[in-house]
Amino acid sequence: QRIVADEPDVLIYPDVGMDPLVQQLAPLRLAPVQCSGAGHPVTTGLPNVDYFLGSDLMETDNAQANYTETLVRLPNLGISPASDALPALQACHPPGALEGRSRAGVIFLCAQDPRRMMPGHDYLFARILQGVPDAERWFIASTREDVTRAFRRRLSRTCESYGVDSDSRCVILPRLASVEFGWVIHEVDLVLDTSFWSGCSTTFESLHRGTPVMTLPADSMRGRRSFAILRHLGLDELVAGTEKEYVSLAIRLATDRDFYAARLAEIDGIRDRLSGDESVIRALEDFLDRSLTGDV
């Protein structure tokens, strides 16, 4: 009722599908022009959502086929995140689950919810650990305990088939507060992105804190967000083209000190480009003006 009373010209839902209330509002026609942002990186499938505000770098040439909305390809990453929203490193601290644990020689992190990890990719985790004997792989528990338990069983079976002891080399951390997550991101040596449903805000934070992220892009936008961020920043050496390359790249970053140091230097040189892309804001303004006159 409040929205209807305000009579908005344009209504933008940043992430349809992430909040139950928004999920109830989005099917309604509450404004002449209604848009979905890419906070939830899939089509809404709703006839009253007219446009999907996407990213030119994240989408493939035929991406419109993935949307019921008209896809609006905003320049570059389609977003302009604010790095000052992250907690200062000085305020970050390790999670209690890591107290008293000796540091491994190399620490890989997979920062996504296990629900985003496809069973067919579990072998990649095992092969990487097999190739770096002094490495650990850290994961973060799902918001659902049953998913975490199932993932742990999956991981154990797959690692065992590759001769890797998952109990000693795979750590599943509990859900983390932002100050704990900030410490973890800074502490690990490399973030291994998930291909089917890649990171976005986690990738921005990792690079902001100076930690490399490597990825294997998928075909749809939800699996191409880290790829687009790395491509936009010129960090192409951190992008794998195949699953075999994904494994070999992770092993090289963990074992080739010069190659790893070069990636750290590249990240240090581009951190000021992680936020403040005014071209995205100007393009969104232009699109909204044109959408109200039907000139889109």
PLM features: residue spans?
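A donor-sugar binding/catalytic signature common to diverse glycosyltransferases
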Residues: 10-31, 35-46, 178-226
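Conserved catalytic-core segment of nucleotide-activated headgroup transferases in glycan assembly
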Residues: 76-177, 290
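C-terminal amphipathic helix plus adjacent low-complexity
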Residues: 112-114, 141-143, 150-158, 248-296
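Catalytic binding pocket for nucleotide-activated donors in carbohydrate/polymer assembly enzymes
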Residues: 185-186, 190, 194-275
